[in-house]
């Protein structure tokens, strides 16, 4: 028994522990419940009672030697890890935390939502991947309308039994879904991201944010529409802003108009931004076309309504005097940091 202890002591002394794997192997061989040291302790009961105290002391010393070797290895590995870790100079000044800010387009969209919800409008949303039934058909777009061409719309699939699938070109499909799901009176705004196959320039982009509004009730008139837009424009651009309504055409409204405000840069005198006109377009609007009402299951003889739509990003350009819409989508921190609160 004593010779076995001496042999095991020699094995422990000569065992090389160079990494965590070898340390684990050492523990499994010597110190676990079924290891070599535990095996010798199990044989202690077979030793003569006169020699048992002395052999027990030798076994305890053997166990302590193994545990000490483990502690030394773990301490060595910990010191090496500390030495390899990157040093930290606590005397250096700390880095200032970066103060983020809300994106200018999101600031404008948030203000738009607050203005219209204060007027009694609720917020409705819908899918960006849309069927042409909701994007075109129910909105009174004729089959040969240019907006249905590949040059203007991003089609995902065409010629499917359930209809063409596309990236919505406006948030008007949300209005259609609301009219199909709810009964009048209806008063909603529909903010969201839209997509158009347009050339990218300082004034246009292939993806942008839009907010549209819809109000349907009895005896709604164009005068109600003008009052709503005037109230919005004064809260959005200032009480001294001037507006003008120009006759226009949209398949889903009749009569239709486009709304301009005085140019933010020249104050109406004429400059390169407003193309010497003194005016900048902010939205399109009009009375909901009777065909749209019929397509959505609403009787146009009983109900009337108005709709409007505006580009959130273009409104942000107006408010913050940004001359290139591409800046809103490039995520250049040098530009965005100017809007830090």
Curated annotation (Swiss-Prot):
Per UniProt, the keywords (alphabetical) are: Aminoacyl-tRNA synthetase, ATP-binding, Cytoplasm, Ligase, Magnesium, Metal-binding, Nucleotide-binding, Protein biosynthesis
Q: How does it assemble?
A: Tetramer of two alpha and two beta subunits.
Q: How is the cofactor bound, in the record's words? A: Binds 2 magnesium ions per tetramer.
Tell me the cofactors it needs. Answer: Mg(2+)
Q: Could you tell me which NCBIfam families the record lists for this protein?
A: pheS (TIGR00468)
Q: Does the keyword Plastid apply?
A: no
Q: What PROSITE patterns does this protein's entry cite?
A: AA_TRNA_LIGASE_II
The name of this protein is: Phenylalanine--tRNA ligase alpha subunit
- Give its localization: Cytoplasm
E.C. no: 6.1.1.20
Q: Name one Pfam family in it.
A: Phe_tRNA-synt_N
Q: Which residues bind Mg(2+)?
A: 254
**GO MF, any single term:** magnesium ion binding
**Which terms in the GO cellular component ontology are assigned?**
cytoplasm
């Amino acid at each position: 028994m004593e010779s076995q202890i001496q042999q095991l002591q020699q094995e422990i002394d000569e065992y090389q522990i160079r990494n965590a794997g070898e340390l684990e192997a050492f523990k499994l061989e010597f110190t676990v419940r079924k290891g070599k040291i535990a095996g010798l302790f199990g044989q202690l009961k077979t030793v003569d009672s006169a020699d048992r105290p002395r052999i027990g002391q030798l076994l305890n010393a053997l166990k302590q030697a193994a545990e000490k070797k483990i502690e030394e290895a773990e301490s060595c590995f910990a010191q090496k890890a500390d030495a390899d870790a990157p040093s930290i100079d606590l005397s250096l000044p700390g880095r200032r935390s970066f103060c983020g800010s809300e994106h200018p387009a999101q600031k404008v969209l948030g203000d738009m939502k607050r203005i219209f919800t204060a007027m009694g409008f609720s917020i409705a949303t819908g899918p960006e991947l849309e069927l042409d039934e909701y994007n075109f058909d129910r909105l009174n777009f004729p089959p040969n309308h240019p907006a249905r061409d590949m040059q203007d719309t991003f089609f995902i699939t065409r010629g499917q039994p359930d209809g063409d699938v596309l990236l919505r070109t406006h948030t008007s499909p949300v209005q259609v879904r609301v009219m199909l799901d709810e009964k009048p009176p209806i008063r909603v705004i529909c903010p969201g991201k839209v997509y158009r196959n347009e050339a990218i320039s300082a004034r246009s982009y292939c993806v942008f944010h839009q907010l549209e509004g819809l109000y349907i009730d009895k005896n709604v008139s164009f005068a109600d529409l003008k009052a709503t837009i005037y109230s919005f424009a004064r809260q959005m651009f200032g009480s001294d802003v001037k507006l003008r309504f120009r006759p226009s055409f949209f398949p889903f409204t009749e009569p239709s108009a486009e709304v301009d405000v005085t140019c933010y840069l020249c104050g109406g005198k004429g400059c390169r931004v407003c193309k010497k006109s003194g005016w900048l377009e902010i939205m399109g609007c009009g009375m909901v076309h009777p065909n749209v009402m019929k397509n959505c299951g609403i009787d146009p003889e009983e109900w009337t309504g108005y709709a409007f739509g505006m580009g959130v990003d273009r409104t942000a350009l107006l408010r913050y005097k940004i001359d290139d819409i591409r800046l809103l989508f490039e995520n250049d921190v040098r530009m965005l940091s100017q809007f830090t609160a």
